């Protein structure tokens, strides 16, 4: 799976469930760690890039969010709430995966109880409710989600709700911390042969192993040195 940025966001989007994509708004490259949610502009760019994912069926056949996204511009306060949710999710992911990556340390909420509080607070930010639509034949009944919040507020709660389902469902057992050199990303191991978050990390790891085999004792960058994503 190729590593890419979409529609103006600098953050990598790997086609993962949205809670994982949110976790991956912290990423690393040869210049160090980056945070797409460092300000409201970065959050707005990321929401624009993933807006289509909130449509009906876009997330594993789940209900769509009937609030236009990115409807409304997120402000500094909401950007902070997205960071709190993201850091909470990264903290829980680190606990679930027993994440050994030193470079990823400090990119998530280290205390599980605090991380859970962050997720629950985000769920309550703009509560969602179901709405039934019943189209005339040949249509079919459909469920959408509504919210009284703005688009960005509803997106925050939607992602938090999706994270609750992820951590309490089968995907939790497939959540992985990418072992690529210097990588700090997470992914869902949807295929038993998948080892890396992206082909970029897989290729880098293979090059590292090849180099080590042919240059015994060489000081090749390890998994916690700069240089994960280009």
Language-model-derived ranges and their functions:
Residues 1-177, 185, 217-230:
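Short helix-coil boundary/hinge micro-motifs
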Residues 205-215:
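Short metal-binding segments enriched for Cys and/or His
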Residues 186-187, 196, 210-211:
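Aromatic side chains
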Residues 192-202:
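Cysteine-rich micro-motifs
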Residues 179, 184, 198:
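Cys/His/Pro-rich metal-binding microdomains
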Residues 182-187, 205:
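Cys/His-rich microdomains that often coordinate metals
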């Amino acid at each position: 799976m190729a590593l890419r940025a979409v529609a103006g966001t600098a953050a990598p989007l790997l086609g993962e469930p949205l809670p994982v994509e949110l976790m991956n708004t912290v990423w690393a490259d040869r210049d160090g760690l980056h945070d797409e949610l460092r300000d409201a502009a970065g959050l707005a760019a990321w929401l624009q890039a993933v807006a289509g994912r909130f449509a009906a069926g876009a997330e594993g056949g789940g209900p769509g969010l009937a609030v236009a996204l990115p409807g409304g511009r997120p402000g500094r306060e909401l950007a902070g709430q997205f960071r709190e949710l993201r850091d909470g999710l990264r903290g829980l992911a680190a606990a679930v995966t027993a994440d050994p990556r030193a470079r990823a340390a400090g990119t998530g909420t280290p205390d599980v109880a605090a991380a859970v509080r962050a997720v629950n607070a985000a769920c309550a930010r703009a509560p969602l409710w179901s709405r039934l639509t019943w189209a005339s034949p040949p249509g079919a009944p459909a469920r959408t989600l509504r919210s009284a919040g703005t688009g960005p507020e509803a997106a925050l709660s939607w992602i938090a709700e999706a994270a609750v389902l992820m951590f309490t469902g089968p995907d939790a057992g497939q959540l992985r911390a990418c072992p690529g050199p210097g990588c700090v990303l997470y992914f869902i191991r949807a295929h038993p042969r998948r080892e890396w978050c992206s082909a970029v990390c897989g290729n880098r790891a293979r090059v590292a192993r090849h180099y080590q085999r042919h240059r015994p004792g060489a000081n090749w960058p390890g998994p916690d040195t700069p240089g994960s994503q280009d």
